[in-house]
C-alpha cells in the first residue's frame, strides 16, 4: 500500500415504464426550514460535511439518541454532489452488490464486514420508508432510481428527514482543524478550529468531508489534511478515480461521440512485482465512449483507477487540472494495459465472420455489420487494411493483425482528466486504521469516518451511494451510542 506519511502514534409492486415500482409507505411531511445557527455543546455530535454520507450519519446519530447533532457545511448548500449524480437522475443504489464491486487498498475483510452491516434491501427500505423516496428498478442497468428521476428530490428528502430528527445544519461553516481537549468533567472532547468564527467544542466528530473530485462543489481534500495532520492517520495516497482517460483514437482518426459496448480488461504490470501478480480486472460488455480528449464511458471509468493510480504515484500527477504524461513518462511508469475487444465478440467469432463466403464481400462491410461505421473504418486503418479489400484478398498476416486490433487492442493512454472530471477519489484513510464495527478512528478515539474520505470507492452504478449510506449509518449510530448512554 502507498501511504502519505503521518506521525507515528417492500411493499406492493407495480409495473410502470419498464421498472418495478416500489410504493413507499412513508408519510409525507412538510418541509422544515434549515436552522442556520448553532452553539458549542460538549454533548453534541459534529458532522463535518453535508454530502450523502454526512447527512446519513447525522440522521442516524439523531435517530439513535444523540442530544444534539450539528452538520457543518462549508458551502452554501447541502448535497451538491448528490445533485450532479446519474446525470441529475441520481442512481441511489445497485440492485445487488459484492465486495468485488469496490476498490480499496486496505484489508478486504474490513470492507466486507462494514458492508455486511447493512444490505442493499434494508438500505432500500430506509430510503423508501424513512426518507420518503419512491424507487424503481431500471432493468437494463439493474439500478435503482427515484421514480421522479430527480436528484434534487433525493437531496431534499434526505435533508428534510435530518431536520425532522432535529439535526441542525450550518452553512458557510468551514472547519479547518481538530484538537483534543478536556470536556471539563474528566473526559475528552474535541475543539473545532473554524475558519471565520471562534473555535467550538463538541463531544464527538464524524468526518465526512469527501475527497477531491468535482472541486467546484467545495471538495478540496481538507478531510485528508485533518486526518493526517490532526488525527495522526496515514493516507493511502489519493488519486482521481472513475475518471475519463486521454489518448489517441485508433487509426489516427477522430471519433468523438462514437459509443460501443465492449469487453475491456486491465492486464497488470508484468515482471513479477507484487502489483504484477494481481488478477486481470474486467469490465464486460459495458459502454465505451470516444471523447474529444480520449476515452470515457462506464467500461473506461470502472477501470481507470488501474492506470491513474500508477501514473499519479510514479509521476505525482494528482493535480486538479488535466494530467497528461509524455510517452517517456508512460513507459517509465510501467502502467497496466487496458485491452479492449470491440463489440465484445471473441477472436474465433471474428475469424469466422472474416472467413465466411462470399469471398467478394468487402472486409469493411463485415466490420460494419458489428461495429459503428466510423469505428470500423478506423480499426481497418489501424490494421493497415484498405477499405476496398475483399475477404478473399485478405492476406493471412493482415488477417492476424486485424484480429488483434478487433479483439485485443491496447488503448494508448496518455493521461487522465484529473479531479475536475473524476466522479470519486481513490485512496484516503485506510480501513485498517478504522474500527470496522463502528467506523471510529483507531488513532484518535471520538472521531468517526464515513464516505469518500475513506480508502473505498465503488464502480459505476450506485455503489458509491451504497458506501455513503452504509458507512454513514454505521458512523452515526456508533457516534450517538456513548452520548445517549450518558444522558
Q: Where do the language-model regions lie?
A:
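N-terminal Rossmann-like FAD-binding beta1-loop-alpha1 element of flavoenzymes
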Residues: 43-71, 475-480
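Residue-level recognition of phosphate/Mg2+-coordinating polar/acidic sites
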Residues: 77, 98, 107, 122-142, ...
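Short beta-strand to alpha-helix junction loop
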Residues: 111-119, 141-160, 214-219, 246-250, ...
